[in-house]
C-alpha cells in the first residue's frame, strides 16, 4: 500500500472487533482521557517508539483524530515509517462517538 485508505467508522468498528487492525488515537492527552475508543492506543511523539516496537509493520493500523483531518497526515507518516496497511478514519472520534456512544472509554489507559 503506497497510499493510506480512508474508511468510515463502521468499517473501523468492524476491523477493530474482528482484530484485523489496531486503532491509534492521535488526539491530545486531555481529549483522549475524556473519551476514546476502547482498545485505542494513544499515539503521541512520546509513544511512537513503543508503538513501532510492539507492532509488526504488516499490522494494519487505523488512525483516528478529532474529525478525520489530522489523521490523514499521521496515516501517511506511518506508511513512510514502513507500515504496510494504514487507514484514516473518516469523521474521527466525533463520528465514532455519534455512531457508537456506548463504546467510549474514559481515562488515560
Swiss-Prot record:
Signal peptide: none annotated. It holds the Pfam family Rhodanese. SUPFAM superfamilies: Rhodanese/Cell cycle control phosphatase (SSF52821). Its EC number is 2.8.1.1. PANTHER family: FAD-DEPENDENT OXIDOREDUCTASE, THIOSULFATE SULFURTRANSFERASE GLPE. GO terms for biological process: glycerol metabolic process. The active site is at 65 (cysteine persulfide intermediate). One of its GO terms (cellular component) is cytoplasm. InterPro entries: GlpE_sulfurtransferase, Rhodanese-like_dom, Rhodanese-like_dom_sf, Thiosulf_sulfurTrfase. It comes from the Bacteria. Keywords: Cytoplasm, Transferase. Residues 17-105 form the Rhodanese domain. Transferase that catalyzes the transfer of sulfur from thiosulfate to thiophilic acceptors such as cyanide or dithiols. May function in a CysM-independent thiosulfate assimilation pathway by catalyzing the conversion of thiosulfate to sulfite, which can then be used for L-cysteine biosynthesis. It is found in: Cytoplasm. NCBIfam families: PRK00162.1 (NF001195). Belongs to the GlpE family. One of its GO terms (molecular function) is thiosulfate-cyanide sulfurtransferase activity. It catalyses: thiosulfate + hydrogen cyanide = thiocyanate + sulfite + 2 H(+); thiosulfate + [thioredoxin]-dithiol = [thioredoxin]-disulfide + hydrogen sulfide + sulfite + 2 H(+). This is Thiosulfate sulfurtransferase GlpE.
Amino acid at each position: 500500500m503506497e497510499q493510506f485508505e480512508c474508511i468510515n467508522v463502521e468499517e473501523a468498528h468492524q476491523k477493530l472487533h474482528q482484530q484485523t487492525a489496531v486503532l491509534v488515537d492521535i488526539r491530545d492527552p486531555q481529549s483522549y482521557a475524556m473519551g476514546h475508543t476502547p482498545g485505542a492506543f494513544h499515539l503521541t511523539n512520546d509513544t511512537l517508539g513503543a508503538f513501532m516496537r510492539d507492532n509488526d509493520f504488516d499490522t494494519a493500523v487505523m488512525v483516528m483524530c478529532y474529525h478525520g483531518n489530522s489523521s490523514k497526515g499521521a496515516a501517511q507518516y506511518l506508511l513512510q515509517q514502513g507500515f504496510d496497511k494504514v487507514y484514516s478514519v473518516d469523521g474521527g472520534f466525533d463520528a465514532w462517538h455519534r455512531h457508537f456512544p456506548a463504546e467510549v472509554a474514559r481515562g488515560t489507559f
